[in-house]
């Protein structure tokens, strides 16, 4: 989400191309779709007989019911948070600094690393934190494409649901508590890093 979000925000902000507004609007799709609909749609698209999955199946690459499918679902539901966090920062960024650096002989990579990245990094981390918070407890959009294969594609929310259905409340509570602690540590670390980077950037 972090890398794809930065790349997509950069393309939407810095380049003009046909149907740009349509593509920009598609970013909001995960917010509008019910999670179950998103999960069923992704599973259909990436199954061996789906539009996208059938292409990969020719090379014996399976996407649905694998960890790759879970990753794709996580990216789908999380990338809008990263893109929408970065876009306003890129739009407000003064292009004169980049143009001046280019005139002085700096490479595009150097310009991005020294000028653009320090500006967008706090926003990117904030977006990543939101995407992570959404993904860690996601159920509907992931459960279908995951397939719930034991020890391979079982997702934590589904394990909790299974434990509850078995009336094993202590196990469900323990797993949920571990998830809660893990999420808190990750989000706290992201916020701490974001604060540190902002402080360094502001001198």
Predicted segments, located by residue:
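Transmembrane alpha-helices and adjacent helix-loop boundaries
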Residues: 32-39
């Amino acid at each position: 989400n972090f890398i794809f979000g930065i790349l997509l925000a950069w393309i939407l902000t810095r380049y003009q191309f046909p149907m740009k507004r349509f593509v920009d609007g598609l970013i909001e799709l995960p917010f509008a779709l019910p999670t179950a609909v998103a999960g069923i749609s992704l599973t259909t698209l990436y199954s061996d007989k789906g539009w996208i999955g059938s292409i990969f199946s020719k090379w014996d690459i399976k996407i649905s019911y694998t960890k790759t499918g879970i990753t794709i679902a996580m990216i789908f539901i999380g990338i809008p948070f990263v893109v929408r966090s970065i876009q306003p920062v890129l739009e407000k960024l003064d292009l004169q600094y980049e143009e001046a650096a280019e005139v002085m002989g700096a490479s595009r990579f150097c310009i991005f690393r020294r000028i653009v990245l320090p500006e967008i990094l706090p926003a990117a981390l904030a977006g990543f934190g939101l995407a992570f918070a959404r993904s860690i407890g996601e159920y509907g959009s992931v459960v279908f494409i995951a397939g719930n294969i034991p020890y391979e594609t079982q997702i934590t929310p589904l394990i909790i649901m299974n434990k509850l259905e078995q009336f094993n409340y202590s196990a469900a509570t323990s797993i949920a508590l571990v998830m809660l602690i893990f999420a808190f540590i990750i989000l706290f670390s992201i916020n701490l890093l974001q604060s540190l980077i902002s402080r360094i950037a502001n001198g």
